[in-house]
């Protein structure tokens, strides 16, 4: 028996520094799609290149809050989301792929 996986690769144009706008793109795809897996690009939430924005604690706090909101909205939904975003962990900054399932 062959099982199929439905995959959506989102090629969008995130706006540099506009976390709210970029987050809404993610939410819209999450809420309006029946795929098993949704893949977003590198630095989806911050836009590219974020340059010195990612060095500002208030900006990174907004990134973490946006990821938390997406996680909460995805609870009970089927798609797994892979989201490219900068991630600050214990003072270390990473160019990360966050998997939300």
Over which residues does each language-model region extend?
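Hydrophobic structural segments
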Residues: 1-101
